[in-house]
């Protein structure tokens, strides 16, 4: 009898402790309590941000990999009328999605992110929004892997001190770590999924919010796989930052890969997938699977093209999807649109526009 009473008391205490734990902010996601990486006292609301059901009734502009090229970025933003001549946000009711890979290869990654963070604040006043997605090169920097960093960037923005740059990205209190770690790797807007690398049947077993959270947790775990997780490695080729098998193979095995794509889209109740990461040799946005799959890494950065920028962007407006290609030249006499940029080089470009309709064929 005494033994039974003791059991009841222990059971009561266990339930009381569990219930008390469930009332804490950190219990919004039970995985966080199992994971020993995170100090629960330091959790903030950014761990619980939801990116799986964003509704937007205005125009959407999506930009692919920038790789340190502030000139291509500003050409796109000026051409799409999102910023004015003074580089302030002017677009009304527009959602801008940048699909990751701002850093590396080029020089101006730090300036670009500071500029985009500024635009995030300004856009709100115009009933607009800027969503920045984490790319694999943001992840590489957060993990202290600097093999793709342009030495000029360290010289110009980090006092030519690699240790200072390391602290800025890898230390949890570093300037860029604090901001980049919050970027979502995957976002769903209306019926469109945006992610940097891509999706596959394995990772798509998880929800968007789980993918975002667990990718972040692995980076915060010194980029090592997380305990208590069956998927294991979110920073591998199976994770959304790096998954490029579909993008690389869809030009050659379109029927097979599109079948896989539609299975994944059905899982997320989506119709379109927009990815970067896989550079398009044509320097134009790639479209596959009856215009449901868009590859928007056009290799735009002038740092990877001997000084020639190839800016492109995806425009979604009034249920119409268009790929916009900007043909950019430096001419004294410009028969097209002339754009003077507020960039370190202060270059004036002659810009010719080419648009391609990408709505699905019914």
UniProtKB/Swiss-Prot annotation:
Coiled coil: none annotated. GO terms for cellular component: endoplasmic reticulum; extrinsic component of membrane. Keywords: Hydrolase, Manganese, Metal-binding, Protein phosphatase, Signal. Its cofactor is Mn(2+). It holds the Pfam family Metallophos. Mn(2+) 2 binds at residues 101, 136, 196. Residues 1-23 form the signal peptide. GO terms for molecular function: metal ion binding; phosphatase activity; phosphoprotein phosphatase activity. Disruption phenotype: Ookinete formation and differentiation is reduced by 55-60%; the few ookinetes that differentiate have normal gliding motility. In infected S.stephensi mosquitos, no oocysts are formed in the midgut. However, ookinetes injected directly into the hemocoel produce viable sporozoites that are able to infect mice. In infected A.gambiae L3-5 mosquitos, slight reduction in ookinete melanization indicating that the ookinete cross the midgut epithelium but fail to form oocysts. The active site is at residue 137. GO terms for biological process: positive regulation of development of symbiont in host; secretory granule organization. PANTHER family: SHEWANELLA-LIKE PROTEIN PHOSPHATASE 1. Belongs to the metallophosphoesterase superfamily. SLP family. This is Shewanella-like protein phosphatase 1. The gene is SHLP1.
